[in-house]
Structures are given as C-alpha cells and as structure tokens.
C-alpha cells in the first residue's frame, strides 16, 4: 500500500519534522502541504458507500452504543459484508479515549489483521482508532513516539482507514490529528501527522441528527473554534482561508437553530464542521486548543471533565483578546467580523464585536463563560466543580503544559509562562484580558 508524501527529515530549532510539511514553530516554512482524504462521501445515505470498498477484513471501531441503538452500526456491518468482507467489531471506546484503550484496540487489530479500519461515531472513537492504527502497523512504537509532532512513520502497509462522523464538531474524519488522554498524568496529548489523515471520510447527516442538544452545542463551538483559529494561525494560506471563512459563516447561520431542533440546520452544520476541519488540519490551530487540551482532564479527580467543546467556547473570547494585541492577528479577526457582518469602524471595534457575538452564542447554547461557573454537568453553575484553590495550585503546571502543546507553535502570539498563567486566570474568573 502506498504512503502519503515524503519522509525526509529536517531539523529546525531541535524539532524533527518532514520536509513535506511546514515547521510547527513560528513563521519558518519549507514546502507547505495541503492534505485531505482521498475520497469524501457526503449527503444523506452516504453510509452506503461502504458497499463499494475492496478488501478482505474490516474492523469497525465504535463508542458507547448510540451507533448501535440507532441502527447505523448494523447497517455499516451489513454494507461491508455485502462488499465481501469479514467484519469484526471493537466496541466501547470511551469519551476522551485513554492510552490503555488504544493499546487494547491495537492488540485486537493485530489478532484480526484487518485491511480496512472503519472508525464510526464522534471524535473519540475515530481519534482512538487512528492511534490504534499506528500501533497496529508498528507494534514496537511507544505512545511517546506517537506524540512526536509529524513523526509518524509511513502507514497503509497493513490497512487503509475510513472515518464516519456522527457528531458535528471534531472533524477528525478529515484531519491529521488525534487526541488521546493519559489519565495517570491528567493530560490530553495531540497526535499530529498527515499519515493519520483518513483515506476515506463519510459525512452522512443522518448520523448527526441523533445528537443530543448539549452535544450539538459543544461540538458546534468546537467547530467554530477550529475555523477561527485556522484563519488566524501562522500557517494559514490561500487554500485554507476560504474553507475557514465559509465554515464560520455557516456556523453563524446554523448552530443555534440546530441546537433548537432545526434538522435542516443540523444537516448543514455537519458540512460546516467538516469544512472547518479541512481548514485547521492544514492551517493548524492555536492556544485555545492548547489550553483546552491541558485543562480538560486536569481536574478529573474532582469528578468531572471540562468537555473539550465547552472549554473551547469559554476560552475563545479570551484568546481573541490576547492575540489581538498582535497587529496581524487583529487584522485577521477584523476580516472575520466583516465576513460575519458584525459592523464596526475600527479594527478594535470589530474585535470587540466578534468577542461579544461569541459570548452571546455561548449564552444561547447554555455554555458558561468561565471555569469558575462550569458545573459538573457542563451547564452554567453559581459554583463550578473546580475549586479555586485547586485551580490556583495546579495553574503553573497546566500553563507550562499548554505552552508545550503542539497547537501553541502556530498561534499568532506566543505566550510566556507568566502570560499563559494570567490568561488561564482570566478563563477561570471571566476577567478582562488587558495584557
């Protein structure tokens, strides 16, 4: 099976990357690259594309049961059998999948030896299956090696990969990223490499219509964050900008109505989040995601996670205020405000209007504005589940880990340790970013 791209190494600032990709840290580039799945099947009924797959064995990786409950898992299994394949299921992938789940799934793959891996559901089962795929193809690779930015060896020696999304946010069905949680450390780690971009994506809105309201809100704001961060990223380009802007406009028009039960808008959001994913997979992200990755599981010992999409929604307005101190980023945020029709005469006014719009959207979606008011059920609460003294005690380590996150290098303004701690405090207390 063929591999994507060239794997010659280049050392820049002590970080090894591939010469077919851009450097992750600041505005130093080799040849840029734009990578998408080879095929993308979309529209109602697109799941039937599985009937056309060629292979001998397929392993379907799924999560907690919604795909089975609504009949989509049975249909996928039947379509693959109609294609002449033997099918095995790997079920029960948890939200925010763990390293242990990845290793367990990879072991099942090694025993079954599929030539197609079919990941089906939300971001968690697809992300987990991507990491399982790496371990399946390279049994001796460690999780630490998987997390080396753009350091994955060539895949597709044993299997191809198809991702079928059932939620409208992560867009992992079209991206070069996977997020895996090390619960011993309380840290979410991004795996980033074009090798794990799926070969085939199936974007069937029938699956997304099953999402509960809270999930619509969180995944929708995840998608909005993807699009905005991609547009202001230091790796943005002519190929990613139109995708990001169009996704932002679609989310502006569709998310709140989708949340309130409009199924036509729900279908449109499924496309919007996919466009946002195409943009950020190639333009990269910023410190909203760095902070979300490092706070998500940081307080799990207090009985809850800060759900990724909700974390992005809370942090995005604060990060815009921080990044807008950089003139280039301020201009890009102004472009977004103009494209959304928010008004404003000066760039400062446009940035303020964009921030205000996003905060209103959070209100409409019942997402709190800060960690202090983030309830264990993710809804606004007078007293959230993260105690102030615990947050402050863990703050230095969380800030340091956020700075080291793979998404930080493409942020338009690089924070110091002190600035990251101050920014996280603003996200805890919902205070003004004035630095």
Short names for language-model regions:
Residues 14-116, 371:
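ATP/NTP phosphate-donor binding region
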Residues 100-206:
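Glycine/threonine-rich beta-strand-loop-alpha-helix active-site module
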Residues 169, 274-312, 405-409:
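Glycine-rich phosphate/pyrophosphate-binding beta-alpha loops
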Residues 177-283:
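Carboxylate- and glycine-rich phosphate/diphosphate-binding segment that chelates Mg2+/Mn2+
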Residues 234-243, 257-268, 283-288, 306-309, ...:
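Flexible, glycine/charged-enriched surface loops at secondary-structure junctions
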Residues 301, 305, 309-390, 433:
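Gly/Pro-rich interdomain helix-loop hinge
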Residues 389-435:
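Short, amphipathic C-terminal "tail helix"
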